[in-house]
Amino acid sequence: MAKYRGKPFQLYVKLSCSTMMATSIILTNILPYDAQAASEKDTEITKEILSKQDLLDKVDKAIRQIEQLKQLSASSKEHYKAQLNEAKTASQIDEIIKRANELDSKDNKSSHTEMNGQSDIDSKLDQLLKDLNEVSSNVDRGQQSGEDDLNAMKNDMSQTATTKHGEKDDKNDEAMVNKALEDLDHLNQQIHKSKDASKDTSEDPAVSTTDNNHEVAKTPNNDGSGHVVLNKFLSNEENQSHSNRLTDKLQGSDKINHAMIEKLAKSNASTQHYTYHKLNTLQSLDQRIANTQLPKNQKSDLMSEVNKTKERIKSQRNIILEELARTDDKKYATQSILESIFNKDEAVKILKDIRVDGKTDQQIADQITRHIDQLSLTTSDDLLTSLIDQSQDKSLLISQILQTKLGKAEADKLAKDWTNKGLSNRQIVDQLKKHFASTGDTSSDDILKAILNNAKDKKQAIETILATRIERQKAKLLADLITKIETDQNKIFNLVKSALNGKADDLLNLQKRLNQTKKDIDYILSPIVNRPSLLDRLNKNGKTTDLNKLANLMNQGSDLLDSIPDIPTPKPEKTLTLGKGNGLLSGLLNADGNVSLPKAGETIKEHWLPISVIVGAMGVLMIWLSRRNKLKNKA
């Protein structure tokens, strides 16, 4: 150290240089790797995280791809859209699209399998119903005796039972129907027993190689296919959800019930023994299914649908009989039942056609059932005629319908001409068909589709069309269901027709469930609503006070609300949401009369310019008023 003691500067220089060299060596060996790693990482981030605009564009494109997937349900599409809106990177978007495509492909394959199975079952059912129409036409003649009804039946047991029914007089209508239900149950039990026995026999190797070879050869690729389809599209009557049973084409129990109603209508069956004849027709179909050479799984599915149809008839009959048994005023009970299903105008017309004097409950129930069944035969002509019939301003409604194909001036002129000529509602419908024919549309179906396609509020338009035939609250529920099930405009109309043609008898069950729900709610709220007031507690000893006298005086006479007329039923020309209606404030309210925030946002987006002008004008006006007041105060 003595050597460097006199030269401290040289020592510091050497130490500094050594330190710098060591540091440079270390940095030279480490930094390139860090720089390379950082560069690679930056490249990955650049590829992964797109710019904000590019990401939004990719999300929009992905959402359009999701919309084009045909097999995905509406709820699944909304789920994937929500995930896309939350995606932060391109890889997340690609992964969501991949999952959606896989699910769509899977649903497509299962849908084809189920549709093929359902199509096969429906074709067999159509053939059976056609054969039944040819063979058992005698069953549907309302005035025939029970012995004549047996011409379509090939079972000895059914012959004996039905012959006994024919010997009953009108006073035993209810017993006849009960016996028919018992016979149908007994027949089903016998068929199922024979089916189980044949199944056990077919499992025997010695037998399966002989007589059953032909039947087994038919079944390999069809096992379970019918159950898969029917379990998906149909459910039993205890299922309160209609969404999985309402389809654009009648299937299963709906198809059977509709075919029987058509058959009874074509044969001009009277209301006498109506339910009994309906059950006899169903029994004939059950026997035909049992005697066919169909594969066992298809036969089982078809017989299950027959049993569902029987339960529907039984349930509807029980509800009607219960209502009639509650009161001695049969006309009032009948009116109550009709008004719970039909709209007021239809209920009044039907009530005039029903005879209650001197009739048993079963005979009244037969008349009501027949009219409910006729609701299933509603055609598009009937719907259009009812729309025009129930409108307050026919000319306006006709013009709105014509404007879906013609210009406003021409539509207004034609509408005025037709109303001034005094054409009947049916004649107006015929004229509408002629003018729609010029654009290639020739039927009432096409006209109603045009109405739905051009309606600004699809749900309200569907409700309006249904409400021309059924009670408005039921129409509202069905319209809500239809718009939730289907968004395809081409299929919405089919669902509307299916709701009337296949679910008319469900309306009574729906009303029963609504009544039960109302009772449950009343039971819950009763302790709150009916709790005693402060005055009741002060006056608990029952002494008459001045307040009691005042209350009695105020309660004398008619109620204050009695003088206020009922709210009129909305007219079709105002509720179909056709014609002009794109004003600044249109669409701000939902069906319940509350402000709809999504619709309000859409309205502001579409009309931002006039809204901006109005808001600006109001601001300028307020500033001017403020300054004017200041000047007045100074003066």
From Swiss-Prot:
Residue positions where Pentaglycyl murein peptidoglycan amidated alanine is found in the record: A600
Listed Basic and acidic residues bias regions: 101-112, 193-202
Signal peptide: 1-37
Highest taxon, organism lineage: Bacteria
Nucleotide-binding listed as a keyword: no
Motif extent (LPXTG sorting signal): 597-601
Protein topology in the membrane: Peptidoglycan-anchor
Propeptide, residue positions: 601-635
Keyword Flavoprotein in annotation: no
Protein's name according to its UniProt entry: Surface protein F
Gene coding for it: sasF
